[in-house]
Amino acid sequence: MSAQAGFALRGRNPDVLTCIANLSNDEVFTPPELANRMLDTLAEAWAATHGGTDIWTDSSVKFLDPCTKSGVFLREITIRLIKGLAGEKPDLDERVHHILKNQVFGIAITNLTSLLARRSVYCSKHAKGIHSIVKTFATDDGNVWFARTEHSWKNSRCEYCGASETTYRRGEALETHAYAFIHTDNIKAKAAEWFGGKMQFDVIIGNPPYQLASD
């Protein structure tokens, strides 16, 4: 490597979420640039329907990504809230704690993406780990929830998502790709179970996963 090339590389600090390869058809990671464009559109729509208010300055708004993969939406929402709430909560630690405990929530689509998403928002794959920037979570999930979910088979199809039993009835060693958010008859009760207490989300945003096959 030349001295010039080495200097150029030392000056480059790429966003790690732009450097991760997609894992499968249903784990196509949203580029940060696209996520931010969507959040810009969200802010415009919020202002248009809420008397011109800035969503990023509201400490009561709750956000949910129901199909979290890299955690890019949760991370970028957090970054915007950290800036927007500076006037209301001038102490940075208090501000970050409030945002990540009370405003930003995700439901991961696989075990691997749950770890990746937590790393993106908590700086630790375990929300209550020693490296986590939030010190008061009682579980390793924090507010980025994941647990293995099974399909509900009826006439060779999942009665919730329509997936083929032939394709998706898999062993314990493989992911089921049954997404918890749509595999329930009562999402409000499930959200209360996952995150504790009655939950009401003001914003639901994300990039829904693709299916592994089209049958």
What does each model-identified segment do?
Residues 1-215:
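SAM-dependent methyltransferase catalytic region
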